[in-house]
């Protein structure tokens, strides 16, 4: 984001592991923040913070609600009180039904909070739903890492790739750089009051992705709460923003296997 805009960027997070050294960084748990203006005067706030991943949400639903829903309410109120536009990162899991798992429910409540403050408190906001984001610096360890990150770590440890279920579930993978491009376009075009679906519009089976890595695959019992399919079919981001995702998962995997996972490639 910093490479593509002239804005001064302030990062507020509880981990600085992937924070650039030239950003202004505040180490906070957003559940403890009530007034974001103490960090400065902002032109816009990108609310990208969430406790993610479906499976851990069954064990720790309270953490998901307090972070993804309650903290979003406090942020939305701060933005509306101070006339700061808000871009909220929603989830493609919305389409599997809000009661599918605690994570999806908590993110949907966050969306509803944003809509409520738009309708009744004058909040200028847009919701951007992310589809299976991957790319450089994604987590590779712990319960909150992505599928691609998990498999990269297993490859680095010379372990087989684990598939839960039969591998036929399908996912629409979107590169983080394409996500950033869309967020910048929302800001540049003042595209407020929208819900944008940020997916490539092409999905792959989990087995297909595993085969792209060319490593041994192990199968385990399926896990609850997972959607069978994610696929972005909405064209609003293209129609309104002129956004076109440029990066694809095949090239990313090839680059990773050849030690070039940070190189930007296009179809």
Q: Which stretches of residues belong to each language-model region?
A:
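Conserved C-terminal active-site "lid" loop/helix of NAD(P)H-dependent oxidoreductases
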Residues: 17, 176, 208, 223-255, ...
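C-terminal "lid/loop" region of Rossmann-like NAD(P)-dependent oxidoreductases
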Residues: 166, 195-196, 204-210, 214-234
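NAD(P)H-binding glycine-rich loop region in Rossmannoid oxidoreductase-like domains
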Residues: 30-66
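Single conserved hydrophobic/aromatic residue that forms the stacking wall/gate
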Residues: 1-19
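Conserved Rossmann-fold NAD(P)-dependent oxidoreductase catalytic core, especially the SDR/UDP-sugar
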Residues: 47, 70-104, 126
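Conserved beta-loop-beta element that borders a ligand/cofactor-binding pocket
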Residues: 86, 90-91, 113-137, 162, ...
């Amino acid at each position: 984001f910093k490479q593509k805009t002239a804005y001064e960027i302030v990062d507020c997070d509880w981990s600085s592991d992937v924070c650039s050294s030239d950003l202004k960084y505040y180490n906070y748990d957003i559940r403890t923040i009530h007034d974001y203006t103490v960090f400065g005067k902002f032109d816009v706030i990108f609310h990208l913070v969430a406790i993610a991943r479906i499976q851990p949400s069954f064990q720790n639903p309270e953490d998901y609600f307090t972070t993804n829903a309650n903290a979003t309410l406090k942020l939305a109120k701060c933005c509306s009180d101070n006339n700061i536009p808000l871009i909220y990162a929603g989830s493609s899991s919305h389409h599997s039904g809000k009661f599918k798992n605690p994570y999806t429910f908590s993110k949907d409540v966050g969306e509803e909070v944003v809509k409520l403050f738009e309708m009744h408190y004058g909040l200028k906001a847009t919701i951007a739903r992310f589809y299976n984001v991957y790319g450089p610096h994604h987590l590779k360890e712990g319960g909150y890492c992505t599928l691609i990150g998990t498999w990269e770590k297993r490859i680095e440890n010379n372990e087989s790739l684990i598939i839960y279920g039969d591998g036929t579930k399908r996912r629409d993978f979107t590169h983080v750089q394409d996500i950033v491009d869309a967020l910048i376009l929302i800001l540049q075009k003042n595209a407020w009051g929208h819900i944008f679906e940020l997916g490539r519009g092409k999905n792959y089976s989990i087995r297909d992705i595993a085969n792209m890595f060319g490593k041994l695959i192990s199968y385990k019992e399926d896990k609850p709460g997972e959607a069978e399919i994610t696929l972005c079919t909405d064209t609003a981001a293209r129609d309104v923003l002129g956004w076109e995702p440029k990066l694809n998962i095949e090239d990313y995997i090839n680059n990773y296997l050849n030690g070039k996972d940070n190189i930007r490639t296009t179809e």
